[in-house]
Amino acid sequence: MSQIIGHISQVIGPVVDVYFEGTDAELMLPSIHDALEIKRPNGKILVVEVQQHIGENTVRTVAMDSTDGLQRGMKVYPTGGPITMPIGEQIKGRLMNVVGDSIDGMKSLDRTGAYSIHRDPPKFEDLTTVQEVLFTGIKVIDLLEPYAKGGKIGLFGGAGVGKTVLIQELINNIAKKHNGFSVFAGVGERTREGNDLLREMIESGVIRYGEAFKESMEKGDWDLSKVDYNELEKSQVSLIFGQMNEPPGARASVALSGLTVAESFRDAGKEGEKRDILFFIDNIFRFTQAGSEVSALLGRMPSAVGYQPTLATEMGAMQERITSTRKGSITSVQAVYVPADDLTDPAPATTFSHLDATTVLDRKITELGIYPAVDPLASTSRILDPHIVGQEHYDVAQRVKQILQRNKELQDIISILGMEELSEEDKLVVNRARRVQRFLSQPFAVAEQFTGVPGVMVGIEDTIKGFRMILDGEVDNLPEQAFLNVGTIEEAIEKGKKLLEQAKK
């Protein structure tokens, strides 16, 4: 097929119309989702993606970067296929953008065998399911909404309730404990958080730039000439970013770019070797939001609450690719921003149906000073089942939920009549529920710089033992404050004894 060259006919914000002259049977128009390249006057290449065919010889495209400086009549070159992402050992420890270019200032990436970002989900006969729990070391999650290996997990919450901190703690705990590989897609979030995440990962050794670079970083420098590329390939994570300042085309596609990298690692295992990949997305709502912006720019009629009419289709197409096959598993953790704390908004509501476990963060719990601010009654998990987690774990989890639910029902009576009007049995329920509620908190390693308290990871046996002791009344004599921001029940008992001694003085 002969190469055809188009020309820009119209630019409206991030939407670029491209006109192809003399298009006949031999010279085909670029297909939907094909990438086209525009050479800017400064020599840099702008990638645009075909979204619509309008008229006979014109395609409407959405830009993956700023369209500043484009003019009508500039030449546009089809690439002959969709946007692709580089693959292999070379991308370990690297930062990439939506089109797979490195954005960390280091050497450029080789495109040999690159994967297209628009791929079909695996065939039905290739899928597998694993009924195995992925323990995180976070008490409230492991006890009440355990995560499934190879499952999809959603962290729901409004603005500023701790979704990103929880995702960073999960990366810290799981990536260190589970020696597999992680992929992080930053979708429409703050650039500062991406910068913090990179520094945090270099410090913790999840990304390895080498000792010489680490020493220069600790002195306040950022000298990329000191990066050891042999060490870099031992890194356990790749980062793909399309942040808040990017145009909507980039934010809508960067989740697919990150997913493509995760799929490439899942499928790269040798025969008989299973790869377990962790895929973090922060934030899946921004993917929907960017899709809504693109939809409006392309002139589609909006649907409920102003979202795109194709919301469920776009979400389904992406979520169906996040799955486990015979070659390996992808366990995904997705932060979901909840606009105005309304879980019935179409964006979070559409995401719900794809998930195996949901962790709901609640502003009312942050107001009590309990972190992570997980709502234990609103959060759910498909695998909280005695056949999977064991009878003892299941029984303790159900008892915790029952006592918290009963406490919630009694709050109305307390607010009107006061604690004195409760029966002795109900007073006991409220006192134990308040201890349980506080024991669901714990200090995080990633928040240590703010709190000054070292983070802890708590094993599932210690978690079950601690909650069982509270429910059985073995620690009723300790003050409530002893259970706040501690790891194991032993720490709570020690803290409680100190508080009692101080009270006597």
Swiss-Prot record:
Localization per Swiss-Prot or TrEMBL: Cell inner membrane
PROSITE patterns named among the record's database cross-references: ATPASE_ALPHA_BETA
One example GO MF annotation: proton-transporting ATP synthase activity, rotational mechanism
Keywords assigned by UniProt, alphabetized: ATP synthesis, ATP-binding, Cell inner membrane, Cell membrane, CF(1), Hydrogen ion transport, Ion transport, Membrane, Nucleotide-binding, Translocase, Transport
Reaction(s) this enzyme catalyzes, per UniProt: ATP + H2O + 4 H(+)(in) = ADP + phosphate + 5 H(+)(out)
Principal place of residence: membrane
Signal peptide start and end residues: none
EC numbers, comma separated: 7.1.2.2
Topology of this chain in the membrane: Peripheral membrane protein
Function description: Produces ATP from ADP in the presence of a proton gradient across the membrane. The catalytic sites are hosted primarily by the beta subunits.
Record's protein name: ATP synthase subunit beta
Biological source species: Bacteroides thetaiotaomicron (strain ATCC 29148 / DSM 2079 / JCM 5827 / CCUG 10774 / NCTC 10582 / VPI-5482 / E50)
Gene that encodes it: atpD
